[in-house]
């Protein structure tokens, strides 16, 4: 995400070795300082994604493992298939953009596509068609998927920040017999 609000964090899902992410990854559609734009969904290789994040933005990544029952796993797979039906493939531009330090570089979406074996999609319908940092954001998509496993924690107002989601996962990890079974820092 290129918005000023990406500083508050970001939530991705990893399922079967593929990272699943949602955000405003098309700079040509950004408005309101990156707060609004086309909703882009992508799937990419987990290990290559971790390497890209560490190299590009020196991010600290927190990974949580969730133990899914066969029923939960089936529900997650159904939700992923349902979401994918609401999209069309999207190829990010190969044009370089000016970075904060004045240099030219490929967009984040282009790097995801070409450096992490990424598949990118734009939503053509549903609430995810337009990304909005305060409501239709990365946490909403993650919770739409992971909520199928019984972790539906969105606030009644419909907004939850990435840090709140992380705090929930930390609390669950500390509980005995929780479905959150592991935590890793990358």
Model-identified regions with their sequence ranges:
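Non-catalytic ligand/cofactor/substrate-binding and regulatory segments of enzyme domains
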Residues: 1-133, 170-186
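C-terminal or late-domain output modules
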Residues: 147-186
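Active-site nucleophilic cysteine motif
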Residues: 7-10, 128-163
């Amino acid at each position: 995400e290129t918005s000023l609000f990406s500083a508050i964090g970001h939530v991705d899902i990893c399922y079967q070795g593929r990272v699943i992410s949602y955000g405003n990854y098309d700079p040509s559609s950004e408005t309101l300082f990156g707060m609004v734009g086309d909703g882009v969904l992508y799937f990419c290789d987990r290990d290559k994604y971790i390497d890209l994040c560490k190299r590009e933005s020196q991010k600290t990544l927190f990974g949580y493992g969730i133990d899914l029952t066969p029923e939960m796993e089936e529900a997650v797979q159904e939700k992923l298939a349902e979401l994918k039906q609401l999209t069309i493939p999207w190829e990010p531009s190969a044009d370089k953009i000016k970075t904060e330090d004045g240099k030219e570089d490929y967009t984040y979406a282009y790097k995801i596509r070409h450096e992490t074996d990424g598949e990118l999609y734009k939503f053509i319908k549903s609430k995810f068609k337009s990304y909005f940092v305060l409501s239709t954001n990365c946490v909403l998509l993650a919770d739409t998927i992971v909520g199928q496993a019984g972790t539906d924690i969105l606030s009644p107002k419909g907004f939850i920040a990435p840090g709140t989601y992380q705090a929930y996962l930390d609390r669950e990890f500390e509980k005995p017999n929780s479905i959150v079974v592991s935590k890793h820092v990358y």
